[in-house]
Amino acid sequence: MDKIANLALSLKEDMIKDRRYFHSHPETGWFTFFTTAVLAKRLSELGYEVKLGEEVVKSDARLGVGSKEQCQKAIERAKSLLNPNEAKYLECMKDGLTGLTAFIDTKRPGKFSAFRFDIDSVDVTESAEAAHRPCKEGFGSDIAGITHACGHDGHMAMGLALAKLIAKNLDDFNGKFKFIFQTAEEGTRGAVAMEAAGVLDGVEYLLGGHIGFQAETNGGIVCGTNKLLATSKFDVHITGRSAHAAGAPEEGANALLAAAQMALNMHGITRHAKGVTRINVGVLRAGEGRNVIAPNGYLACETRGEDTNLNEFMYKKCMDIVKGVSEIYDVESKVVMTGGTSGANSDKEVTEIFYEAAKQSPFIDDDKIVKELDFGACEDFAHFMRALQDRGAKSGYMMIGTNLKAGHHNSKFDFDEECLVAGVDIYLRAAYKLNGAKK
């Protein structure tokens, strides 16, 4: 093994320990207070300039924030878990301004390269079965209804390890590095607000990735991920008028029927010839009683498109339906955006960097290297990608192979921690290719 492989392998136990620590204390959405504070302390100790709060999140650009009560409850939980040196970071995160960036400068001319790692968990109750390894080995989620069932705990562990290796070997590099630890990836809620705060300013290369998905076994990798779909997440709140269903139905305005009509019409939208489009109404709730004209209704919806224009086509059609059906049923409807991201493709140059790194890595099997693959789903990273590419910068997204016990967002989700070494090895090789000092 070469120097880079040995460096990655040297932090294997640290990464496993970090992954399990974050797994034990999951947080969702904008309420990743504990997670952000722990990361901030660790990165500060490594010599990074850490920024939090309003410096990295534009408050009014956030979507799907949650209630003040939920926010305060999450803060109190974080306080109970943090030591004083960690808890001091909470003040600048109040109101849910979580996530952070960490910056380090070699003081030598060179590229400005960045890495993004997501940090939030998902609203899934973790399996309590004895065979489930986090349960069996004592690092299961400490809170009901929330768990790291998408691998972001592993991403954070890799991010910390990579930050440590770059900081400890800074003489090997030129230029600048930034680490973006993004919250609210689930529901595609976080990237827009962080980008609006300027976290990408000056960045020339942004690298990201995810364990699993189409890289389904240890030793595998997808070097360039394409067709990350654009998406819009929105709720429709419908207000009608209640009335007795038999005695005075004409006095009512039926929000239930309006909601049902909207759902059916949305699913009937003609698809676009220029690429993949998707629509889903995932939740429909309405009504208050058997003999009452339903005065309220609610839809939770999402559109997707192969690119941003295709997604906009679907979203506009949905808005036309909401407006038209509301007029027909004499109801009022309010649309609330809860998330969304752009569509994007990995730059060929970054794909090539990951590909060359994979061929050199002893932790990647040659017969499991896939150079490019379509993702066919959404990832909040795509907003960062698109924003940078529109400025002439480069970005790419890989998938790191791992054996999974169950699929992403499944209550039994767990991954083989060997993939953490492979992931850090690839990221570190990419860092050397982009910013390595000529000696």
Regions found by a protein language model. Give the residues of each.
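Metal-dependent amide/peptide-bond hydrolase catalytic core
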Residues: 257-439
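Acidic/His- and Gly-rich active-site-bordering loop/insert found
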Residues: 2-148, 161, 172-173
